């Protein structure tokens, strides 16, 4: 007798879980690595990653689309997460990422003298000025989510993520608009992506440890 394969609905239900969405979000949030293959004209060491999304940059829509999709994946992941601190932090992180994308920079000050002059005399747009606020919110919520993950898992790698985020946060404040600021931010973004992957791993482990009567361990319980 032929064995009936899993239905499309069942497959979608298995994919619709926080761990999967967090993995996709981590990949999308790391889309800035495409600058290694694209002629962006920005400095890997001195330019901020957000400058890739600036209004005058040729590949801005590639990076903006990736950030928006990544934020949507975080929103989808938050629906089935546990832990109030983690859920709130992920929601704020997603919202701040969307705001960061919508309130994009007018230009890339790290490589454009005219842009720096416009910033000095205050002739940039409101979105350009508010971008720093949304960036701080993004970092703060990512740090809070990492702290929540560390509190839930008590694992050493979660502690490393928190420590790296805190360290790069301090260095970013010290090196604001200075040489090396871009490199510090890129280390910070890689750390955030690592935190998302660790969150996915923790989610899979928690799901695997759940055993519903009559179902094998690791299966998705009925809603």
Would you name each region that the model predicts?
Residues 8-206:
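Hydrophobic, aromatic-enriched alpha-helical segments typical of multi-pass transmembrane helices
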Residues 1-7, 209-223:
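Short, intrinsically disordered terminal tails adjacent to the first/last structured region
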């Amino acid at each position: 007798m032929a064995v009936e394969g899993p239905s499309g609905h069942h497959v979608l239900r298995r994919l619709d879980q926080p761990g999967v969405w967090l993995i996709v979000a981590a990949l999308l949030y790391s889309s800035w690595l495409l600058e290694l293959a694209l002629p962006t004209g920005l400095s890997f060491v001195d330019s901020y990653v957000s400058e890739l999304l600036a209004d005058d940059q040729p590949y801005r829509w590639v990076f903006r689309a990736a950030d928006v999709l990544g934020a949507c994946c975080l929103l989808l992941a938050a629906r089935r997460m546990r832990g109030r601190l983690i859920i709130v932090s992920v929601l704020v992180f997603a919202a701040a990422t969307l705001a960061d994308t919508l309130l994009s920079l007018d230009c890339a000050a790290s490589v454009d003298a005219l842009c720096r002059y416009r910033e000095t005399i205050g002739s940039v747009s409101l979105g350009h000025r508010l971008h720093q606020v949304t960036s701080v919110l993004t970092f703060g919520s990512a740090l809070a989510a990492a702290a929540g993950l560390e509190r839930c898992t008590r694992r050493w790698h979660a502690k490393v993520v928190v420590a790296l985020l805190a360290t790069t946060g301090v260095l970013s404040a010290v090196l604001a608009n200075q040489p090396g600021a871009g490199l510090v931010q890129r280390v910070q973004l890689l750390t955030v992506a690592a935190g998302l992957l660790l969150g996915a791993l923790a989610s899979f482990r928690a799901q695997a440890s759940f055993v519903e009567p009559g179902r094998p361990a690791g299966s998705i319980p009925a809603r």
